[in-house]
């Protein structure tokens, strides 16, 4: 029980001293009660020897300061020491009263780690009323002299008293807000206080900052170089230059050169050819109607494109027509194919020397064919009147006796020729109405050019048309020859059968007039071409009837 009380009291005293009591308090020996003063002396010696070497060194380094502190030691410290000594003696005497019972010795207190010495505090200005009197200073000096005999122990006591005195000025947080104390091995001046980076950390931070700056400078330089390259590229290769290059490549691909020459340049009759070619753009059908089937017309769009550009430069109507038709109605290639086919017809007519004739070099269309057919109808309509007059003249002539057999042969031959002529007229009218292109017959100017002209006519489809025109001319000539031959015959009228003959002739004439009126009601190309011939044969049929009556 006494050991526990001793330990508690010792710890209480150490806490009150505030670090000055860092000494081991050995247990009393218990040999005799008279050993109490010796025990107190041994306790003080042990306390002085148990002081931490580092604390002693610190106290030695501040000898003058320790002596001054010993002089200033307050009465409270001496009072505590006296109480400790008295308590120890009392406890020792108590042990004697209880007998010489062996009380186990108290275990030695482990050496507490020495607190690092506080750095030199700045001088605190003296506050009146807080300092002790001069007498107290003298007592403190005496106590300091007694403690000085112990050497390092006295220094430790002085420093402990100073700490106890300075603890009055420390806040309730026991100096947590103040700078921490540092021991002998704690670097303070070189590496700074807590919260500041140490040497290695500072080096790492500096290195990272330098790397970031280097990376930023690298990025800025790369961006500036890229911007300069882009500017140079834009200056060297502009959009307009690339467009011009593409346009030149397109022109080269189309014709190799720029615009070509107009098709009428270089010909003898240049003005007439130009007029005819420029007139093609006035009719829309010249561009939408393809060449007739079977015509061998060679056309290359790439080759003809420069020529087309040259023609459009002279003919604004052609450009307008192209804008209206391409590509809404017809494609670009077919547009120029149809147009250049008509141009080739005009050039061919100019080479043959027939340019300017009726139908030659004109744009082929249905209207042209209708105009030609109308002219033919008008010419044929005027022929029956001539036929009637010729019939009247023949009737007024003196009649001659005609042999029956010769008359029959002539009648059959005339009928067969009339049928052939009517059939040919029908075919010609049908071909003219169905044909899309009109041209006159072409005659060779010289025998040396005959083969070349025939070849050109075959390519352009003119050969068949020429043959048809020649056939029509032959038929007209045959009609004239037949009429001349019939005029040579004389009709002989004998009395006795004049009444019957006259009646027969009148009937025949009436029937012929009815047929003629029916033909006039429904005019056709074949009727127009055979009307005059039919009137002649009616007259001769009457003559044949009269001859039969005579027999």
From Swiss-Prot:
The modification Phosphoserine is found at residues 178, 182, 433. SUPFAM superfamilies: BSD domain-like (SSF140383). One of its GO terms (biological process) is TORC2 signaling. InterPro entries: BSD_dom, BSD_dom_sf, BSD_domain-containing. It comes from the Eukaryota. Residues 514-523, 536-551 have a biased composition (Acidic residues). One of its GO terms (cellular component) is Golgi apparatus. The keyword Nuclease does not apply. This is Synapse-associated protein of 47 kDa. The lineage of its organism: Eukaryota, Metazoa, Ecdysozoa, Arthropoda, Hexapoda.
